[in-house]
């Protein structure tokens, strides 16, 4: 009995849900079709017309939004012509040349200098006497290794003049040419003469004859 009493008191305190919805707290039924409901303000059939009218007020240039392209909308809003969007590189380069005239002048000067250099090179002629031949070129000083110098000194100690056959053998053994061996022995003989100070007609004539014989061999 007591439990039934408390239940009736509780239900009497909170009215039924049907009465709450009927009184107008939630007068409309929940549905996803907002656009088809004529009683909902802002989503009715006339909302599109009011939105278009408001947009026409913002952009007094004319027509609805659906009929205008993006370029037309921006042109009407910011006072730009549609032809201003068709920009090419040529006017941009012309503007740059107008802003920086010094660069174009430098480029033109460099081109003229290059053309003049090419013309001068084409007109310049090299004659045969201007070219240095292989025999006229200055040869660098030959450097001998320590082993080569030691072997040549040994050979010079035993014989100051070499025959052609012996010169070829030494050249092959020391990886040198015959001319290099010959020049080394000539220089070594001159140094030996200065060191010993050999003077006298007999000795000089004998050395000269031996040198000529060495060159002929």
Swiss-Prot record:
Instruction: Name a GO CC annotation attached to this entry.
Output: nucleus
Q: Which GO terms describe its molecular function?
A: DNA-binding transcription factor activity, RNA polymerase II-specific; RNA polymerase II cis-regulatory region sequence-specific DNA binding
Q: Where is this region: Disordered?
A: 193-217
Question: Entry's CDD domains?
Answer: homeodomain
Q: Which GO terms describe its biological process?
A: anterior/posterior pattern specification; regulation of transcription by RNA polymerase II
What ranges are recorded for DNA binding?
Answer: 137-196
The compartments listed are: Nucleus
**Per its UniProt entry, which superkingdom is the organism in?**
Eukaryota
Q: What is its main location?
A: nucleus
Give the UniProt keywords, A-Z. Developmental protein, DNA-binding, Homeobox, Nucleus, Transcription, Transcription regulation
Q: Where is this motif: Antp-type hexapeptide?
A: 126-131
A Pfam family of this chain: Homeodomain
Q: How does it assemble?
A: Forms a DNA-binding heterodimer with transcription factor PBX1.
The record's function comment reads:
Sequence-specific transcription factor which is part of a developmental regulatory system that provides cells with specific positional identities on the anterior-posterior axis.
| Record family assignment | Belongs to the Antp homeobox family.
- Protein name (record): Homeobox protein Hox-B7
């Amino acid at each position: 009995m007591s439990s039934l009493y408390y239940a009736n008191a509780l239900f009497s305190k909170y009215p039924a849900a049907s009465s709450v919805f009927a009184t107008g707290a939630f007068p409309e039924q929940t549905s996803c079709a907002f656009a088809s409901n004529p009683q909902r303000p802002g989503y009715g059939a006339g909302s599109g017309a009011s939105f278009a009218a408001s947009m026409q007020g913002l952009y007094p240039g004319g027509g609805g939004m659906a009929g205008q392209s993006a370029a037309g909308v921006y042109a009407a809003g910011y006072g730009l012509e549609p032809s201003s969007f068709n920009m090419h590189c040529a006017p941009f380069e012309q503007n740059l040349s107008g802003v920086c005239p010094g660069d174009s002048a430098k480029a033109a000067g460099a081109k003229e200098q290059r053309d003049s250099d090419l013309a001068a090179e084409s007109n310049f002629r090299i004659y045969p006497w201007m070219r240095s031949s292989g025999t006229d070129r200055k040869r660098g000083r030959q450097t001998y290794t320590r082993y080569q110098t030691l072997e040549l000194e040994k050979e010079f100690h035993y014989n100051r003049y070499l025959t052609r056959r012996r010169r070829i053998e030494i050249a092959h053994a020391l990886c040198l040419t015959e001319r290099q061996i010959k020049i080394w022995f000539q220089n070594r003989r001159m140094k030996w003469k200065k060191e010993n100070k050999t003077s006298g007609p007999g000795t000089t004539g004998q050395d000269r004859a031996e040198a000529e014989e060495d060159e002929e061999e």
